């Protein structure tokens, strides 16, 4: 059984997460997915392409609900036609198992999402710090590369599958002195704040589970972002499925904040950026803006001292685009009057 609660949470990690930044990374494998296959036959490849495209659609939108979109569902049977390249790999989790990794056409995926009105979550995404405690045969310990490398690998795969950057604690002397297993499971606010503060991340996922004698797993996930907390209790058939629940909790919550239902028509927006003092600044601003899935073009219209005025051809309104831009901590919103721009920022080095 799974329950989900979202509410304002101002005590546990509140001070830490408000002060910390939503450090973001560019997800480079947004349009690729790896799925299992029985063999290398054309029939298996065709079936796998559909499965892989489902993963990509969910990754790009951030939410599994995108698969209920009629246009998205209608595109799945022809998935094989839109595979740019593929390769086979051994499945490290299944003896003798086989995986196929597929890369899909970026333009096909983005155009379909935009034309269907499905939400699009740009590749610039917040990094999540994960503390995970496992209990087996009465023994509790943090899950890390030494105690449970297979589960760590599963955690990495699930975050990659949902397109969310992952930060695992170092679990060195600094971490273990700041946070004990019991404190993590009890959500001890002071200890979690102290242990997490060194990583300077706004998004923290804390999980704890017990492995039962029949192999089933029972536990709970708590996801903190700023002053908000999401909670999910889960009973799963395996550790892998329990991990999937936790990662899904994060991805769905993030997508609700950052994914934008793009407009099929381009919107012309003027963006003012102050603090541009070198060609490197100039190129950095323009190239980053053009890397956003919701921005078709970013053309510099004028340069006045250290301020540039950029004309954006975007598939989102100004307020929607501002939500995405806030993830770049070098672009700080500023109140500017008399400039005639829809968006105003300071380029902070």
Predicted segments with their positions:
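Bacterial N-terminal signal peptides
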Residues: 8-19
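A short, hydrophobic beta-strand-centered structural micro-motif
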Residues: 81-90, 167-170, 184-216, 325-342
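Signal peptide-directed extracytoplasmic domains
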Residues: 65-134, 141-146
